[in-house]
Amino acid sequence: MIKLIVGLGNPGAEYTATRHNAGFWLIDQLAREAGATLRDERRFHGFYAKARLYGEEVHLLEPQTYMNRSGQSVVALAHFFKILPDQILVAHDELDLPPGTVKLKLGGGSGGHNGLKDISAHLSSQQYWRLRIGIGHPRDLIPESARAGAKPDVANFVLKPPRREEQDVIDAAIERALAVMPMVVKGELDRATMQLHRN
């Protein structure tokens, strides 16, 4: 059963619409659906709400520590409420999936994602759930003929807003993720994964 849903992103209005904030977009939607208000909670270093989602009590969190310090926020809340790693779902942007793709998985490495790296370090575990929201990779925007030897600027890419057509399919992917949330919060994660990956 998932007790804590974390969305990753960077704080500040200048980052709101950037690809790296896809996790925040999901949490904002969940909070709206639950009629919950995210409030600045200093002891958790983030915006926090306790929500009633699909009959279950769930903690929603948007760390306000900047991406590479996300673990500080997650571990503060997890320790306070005695939440285990496998009861945590972290929603994050995923370079290795094209826009419009969304996948669930338990555990694994960070894939170069600094937010995940910091969470794993603070929890001393990689055994938490991830909701991977595809944003694509900057190399995909380079014509194939020019890709050899090209060094795409990943840092610049994730800190820019998606193109309009990308935003539309990312929003649709987040809607599909929201559709399986009743199963997720009830602990039916295998079923949620199968349904999400079928789309």
From Swiss-Prot:
Active site: H20 (proton acceptor)
Major subcellular location class: cytoplasm
Keywords: Cytoplasm, Hydrolase, RNA-binding, tRNA-binding
Enzyme nomenclature, EC number: 3.1.1.29
GO molecular function: peptidyl-tRNA hydrolase activity; tRNA binding
Record site feature (Discriminates between blocked and unblocked aminoacyl-tRNA), residues: N10
GO CC, any one term: cytoplasm
Residues marked Stabilizes the basic form of H active site to accept a proton (site): D93
Subcellular location: Cytoplasm
Catalysis: reaction(s): an N-acyl-L-alpha-aminoacyl-tRNA + H2O = an N-acyl-L-amino acid + a tRNA + H(+)
Pfam family, one: Pept_tRNA_hydro
Function: Hydrolyzes ribosome-free peptidyl-tRNAs (with 1 or more amino acids incorporated), which drop off the ribosome during protein synthesis, or as a result of ribosome stalling.
Assembly and oligomerization: Monomer.
Family that this chain belongs to: Belongs to the PTH family.
HAMAP family: Pept_tRNA_hydro_bact
Protein name listed in UniProt: Peptidyl-tRNA hydrolase
